[in-house]
């Protein structure tokens, strides 16, 4: 089976198993804390995806660590290795700002990209595997799902990999987003979406256009990897996540209309939750251990009432945990970093590399290397990072270095900061900017400051002093010593 041609999650799991990337766990393990402990140890060791076939107290298997290595993220995106994700980024950059062909030859050069675009439309099915089993009304019971409790002080079991499908009242296109959902009853979940996210924006538009009416929502669990990854990738606003998933997979995304609303969900998903949000129905969410390594504070979010649960025969429950990096979101961040680079370079060609260290919670700190061309150039780039893609709206720190620095080597970055920066001159502070609601270090929830560090060599106009020249070895001497190095036998 080709990684480019998997059809659904089960095909992908077969592919992983063939390559030694999936381990089946037959020993009974408790979704309350125990699965997290095993998954965490496995991820930190770079281990396989885990399919817990006998979770204690449940008949449904639990899939964890699906994207626990960058390699598996790349495979989910239809690529053989992480480096190939740069090509995905180039395609997204092209789709974000397509350029018309400059001539006949250029048209032929662009044909592969245009051919990929032809795979974009979805394929609508009348019936689908995700609707093989149906529960509605009093038969709806979310407690039958093996929803994990990840950390000792978590408020309740938490759905983590739910792909939430919404549509605003004035939009033709649906929005797909991944928002955690706290289990509070047999048919009740808390939908934790932040105000700037697509689902929350759709809901706010609905409230304004149709006050008092229930807002339709559906959640897909266990969708195919391309569709899941499409929801966490910087897809252009003009492109749907389903269409992007089709590009990754090489085939059109198959969808089916829900039973209780007009939303379209992935036809091959393992489980679908259908329901609504009643305007004004809110509940306190949390606390939960999160990707920061801390428990977040309790806050109020809308309640999602589930009216239907549809699923495949022998459905698989897809889950994960979040905690201090490395965790699965951090691994996703490392892989998606390669997608971001070409998108940024399309807008800012002077950028050489861009790196989001996973230990910085994958998005709170960015290191940029660039070919500096004029005084003040580094500040333009840091402002561009904050404003160009909404994925970096919450990036608190941006460090800009010259292209002789390796953005992914802290030794290099720290050297540049300590030798090329004056703290007063080269630090930019911006107050009252959007900040992650989970960032308890900010003085106000959702609002805080940002810091830019210009660790580039300074040009005339930025300094009046003679600037230092880096030490460079004599290449002829290096070559002579290379030739006699083994003969010296220093380490033998």
From Swiss-Prot:
Encoding gene per record: ubiD
Catalytic activity as recorded in UniProt: a 4-hydroxy-3-(all-trans-polyprenyl)benzoate + H(+) = a 2-(all-trans-polyprenyl)phenol + CO2
GO biological process: ubiquinone biosynthetic process
Active site per the UniProt annotation: 290 (proton donor)
Cofactor: prenylated FMN; Mn(2+)
Pathway(s) this gene product operates in, as recorded in its UniProt entry: Cofactor biosynthesis; ubiquinone biosynthesis
Protein keywords: Cell membrane, Decarboxylase, Flavoprotein, FMN, Lyase, Manganese, Membrane, Metal-binding, Ubiquinone biosynthesis
GO cellular component: cytoplasm; cytosol; plasma membrane
Full protein name: 3-octaprenyl-4-hydroxybenzoate carboxy-lyase
GO molecular function: 3-octaprenyl-4-hydroxybenzoate carboxy-lyase activity; metal ion binding
Domain of life: Bacteria
Protein topology in the membrane: Peripheral membrane protein
Keyword rRNA-binding carried by entry: no
Keyword rRNA-binding in annotation: no
Residues reported in the UniProt entry to bind Mn(2+): 175, 241
Lineage of the organism: Bacteria, Pseudomonadati, Pseudomonadota, Gammaproteobacteria, Enterobacterales
N-terminal signal peptide: none
Family (UniProt): Belongs to the UbiD family.
Co-factor: note: Binds 1 prenylated FMN per subunit.
